[in-house]
Amino acid sequence: MFLADHPFADRSNSTSNTLGTDNPWANQIVPFNACAFFVTSRPTRHYLLSIALLLLLPEFIWGNEATKPAPSYANGAPVDSNGVFTNDKGDIAHGSASVRVPFMLRRFGTYLRSDKGAPEQIQDAAAQLQANIQAGQPAVTWVGHSTTLVQIDGINFLTDPIWSKRPSPVPLLGPRRYVAPGITLEDLPVIDFVVISHNHYDHLDLPTLVALAKKNPQTVFFVPMGNGKLLRENGITEVVELDWGQTTAYKNLTVHCLPSQHWSKRTLTDTNKTLWASWAVTGGERRVYYAGDSGYFPGFTEIGRQLGPFDLVIVPIGAYAPRAMMLESHMNPEEAFDAASDLGASKALGVHFGTFDLSDEPLAEPPQRFLNTGSSATAAAPTPWIFKIGETRSF
């Protein structure tokens, strides 16, 4: 693929060294204060503001009904007639109001929801990781949610790192974290680079990214088109933006920016103005694919044909219920296993479940269904992997 013109993104693949603004959180969300203008009582104003925040939070994770016209594009990631990114099939549906409104109301109850079924956490995670580092084996560690630490060819990289307690524009609100990160930031090895799939708060966690950049200023952050501005404005300097179909070298590895079927939104006014993506990292030692967030789509087969087979495929298996709302943007466990098969995976690691309360399915359901699907598959199918939080395995 070649690059396509896009009004919201500088479609270059060079590393930017532009420093951010004086305020490290300058671009965080502040669209909720309108109601406060009309309220003079401070307690009442705070109460109404809290209610508004709670009602609007789901919009930053699950979005709204697709209304944009069919895509018009030639090269790179599709761009629709409104000048925003879209998918190969056009805009994806997010369910009718009759599905979405009850779903959002149910999210209020999750503040009291039990953590029964949340993933177990191993007790010796740091020691296990350190032992593997000393052994020098290709390995993957599940930190939690979609965050993994991958070690291949002497390189350490992270996928969608989030160490925050809540994926939210407001630290005290949003889905709570059931299980702490399996590895502390302090126990991480030197991180060479990070891949970000899209700008939703459970995947692009600014506090974590800033902390990683401060810990090692040489860490490179690979992001889909349009996402670099937010990082640079928060003081992260080593940022590389890529379009679908673009590749770049990192030492002895090749980093591939690839399609996924999803969407983006971080404020009330920026829907699909930044790109979403999946990633492949290939080298002489191992080939790894990270799906990010995605509905099941034909692109998996094409990626597998062009770049597979993969030694490890990391696929999201949670946040799929209700299906009327999630079908086109989040795979269920069976679809995730099929995607790994399409990609030519040897090992398929299920992630994106059990860490945050994002959807209606029981916390323990995604890994059970994923393993059940794998156990009934043919011998040539991928081996399904479900980790405890903090677990490391070589591959």
Regions found by a protein language model. Give the residues of each.
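Intrinsic-disorder-associated, low-complexity terminal segments enriched in Asp/Asn/His/Tyr and depleted
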Residues: 5-6, 10-13, 17, 22-23, ...
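Metallo-beta-lactamase
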Residues: 23, 27, 31, 46-50, 116-135, 224-286, 369-391, ...
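Cap/insert and terminal regions of metallo-dependent hydrolase folds
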Residues: 59, 64-67, 73-80, 87-88, ...
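Active-site metal-binding motif and surrounding structural segment of the metallo-beta-lactamase
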Residues: 77, 100, 173-223, 238, ...
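Catalytic core of the metallo-beta-lactamase
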Residues: 148-151, 249-311, 327, 331-334
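Acidic/histidine-rich helix-loop elements
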Residues: 161-180, 263-271, 321-330, 357
